[in-house]
């Protein structure tokens, strides 16, 4: 176990250039390449990238469908977006469409609740 700790200490004291040279020497000795290791680590890195995505700061509120109460949903869309009657009606009838983009989480949740109360199905992306 003391040998492993010595190896860890020695590796920790290497400069970046020395570590790169060590990597090349080990690649040659073991007959492997760092590119293969990166390809294998790629999916694991993708999983790690998904975690920060959960902490998004900007959301898009998407109207999935208007539901049964289309007129109520149109009224809410107008109130939320400031669109005219025709534009709001076109947006609601063309669902799924984004209602508001680039909003923070609190505002997105508030908009979602408003639209769902009116009878719409809403997604946050």
From Swiss-Prot:
The keyword 4Fe-4S does not apply. GO terms for biological process: translation. Signal peptide: none annotated. It comes from the Bacteria. The keyword Ribosomal protein applies. Pfam families: Ribosomal_L12 (PF00542), Ribosomal_L12_N (PF16320). Belongs to the bacterial ribosomal protein bL12 family. Homodimer. Part of the ribosomal stalk of the 50S ribosomal subunit. Forms a multimeric L10(L12)X complex, where L10 forms an elongated spine to which 2 to 4 L12 dimers bind in a sequential fashion. Binds GTP-bound translation factors. Forms part of the ribosomal stalk which helps the ribosome interact with GTP-bound translation factors. Is thus essential for accurate translation. This is Large ribosomal subunit protein bL12.
């Amino acid at each position: 176990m003391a040998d492993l700790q010595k190896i860890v200490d020695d590796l920790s004291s290497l400069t970046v250039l020395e570590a790169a040279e060590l990597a090349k020497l080990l690649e040659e000795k073991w007959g492997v390449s760092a590119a293969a290791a990166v390809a294998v680590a790629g999916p694991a890195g993708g999983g790690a990238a998904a975690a920060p995505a959960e902490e998004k700061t900007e959301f898009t509120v998407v109207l999935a469908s208007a539901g049964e109460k289309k007129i109520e949903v149109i009224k809410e869309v107008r109130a939320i977006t400031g669109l005219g009657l025709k534009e709001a009606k076109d947006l609601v009838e063309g669902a799924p469409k984004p209602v508001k983009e680039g909003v923070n989480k609190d505002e997105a949740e508030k908009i979602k609740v408003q639209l769902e109360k009116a009878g719409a199905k809403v997604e946050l992306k």
